[in-house]
Design a protein with these regions (language model features):
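Extended, histidine- and acidic-residue-enriched regions that form the cofactor-binding/catalytic faces
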Residues: 1-63, 69-219
């Protein structure tokens, strides 16, 4: 899904952004109970991102975005940028950002009333719908998949978990509600949201912390 979204956005912003290849390997240790999972440990993934971003810094790039499409990458990616910023702490001209494509503000259920989930899960209504739109031959018997509610009873605390703690089949959410139509709506909505956000990054003044206030982002 992330690759499709990036491709769409790149077509609109090709003269203003440079898109690196999508990384196929991330931190998926929480899925290792399911046969065939390939995962980089969190430290390996951290080191890989550290090296890649430092490469771009050495070439003179100052605005670097890590655009994420997998929940397991969220914490390591944020930590990687934190480490990089501390190593380059005397610089005031860097904008190092990490964002997840479904977390930039869009609320899909406000665009399509039949979308039921209120947050991303795993192989859920949202993801299953997008795969139905892109590669329907990869989708199995989603109509009979049981509901597995997202979230945890201890929110707002962040509970450590493995996928098997939450789901015997590996999905989280309501995949039985997925549809090709919803998938197209979601892909279009997320692509538009990513493009809007990147346009704000492009318009950053080059050294201000409070530039986000000027651009209308919550601080």
């Amino acid at each position: 899904m992330l690759g499709e979204i990036v491709d769409r956005v790149e077509k609109s912003l090709s003269k203003q952004i440079l898109v690196a290849p999508v990384l196929w390997l991330g931190n998926s240790d929480h899925h290792l109970d399911f046969f065939g999972t390939l995962s980089a440990s969190s430290r390996t993934y951290l080191d890989m991102l550290n090296d890649l971003v430092e490469n771009f810094l050495s070439y003179g790039f100052k605005r670097i975005v890590l655009l994420n499409g997998h929940g397991g990458n969220d914490i390591p990616a944020k930590q990687a940028l934190f480490e990089i910023r501390q190593r380059n702490r005397i610089r005031t001209d860097l904008l190092l950002l990490m964002a997840t494509y479904w977390g930039l503000g869009i609320e899909p259920w406000t665009i399509h009333s039949a979308i039921t989930q209120r947050e991303m899960g795993h192989a859920c209504e949202w993801e299953t719908s997008m795969v139905l739109a892109l590669r329907p031959e990869l989708v199995g018997d989603y109509k009979n998949a049981p509901v597995v509610e997202p979230g945890n009873a201890f929110r707002p605390a962040n509970r450590a978990w493995t996928t098997k703690d939450r789901s015997s089949l590996g999905h989280i959410g309501w995949p039985h509600l997925a549809s090709h139509e919803k998938g197209n709506v979601l892909l279009s909505a997320f692509s538009a949201d990513v493009q809007r956000w990147l346009e704000e990054v492009i318009d950053w003044d080059g050294n201000s912390w409070d530039g986000t206030k000027h651009f209308g982002f919550p601080v």
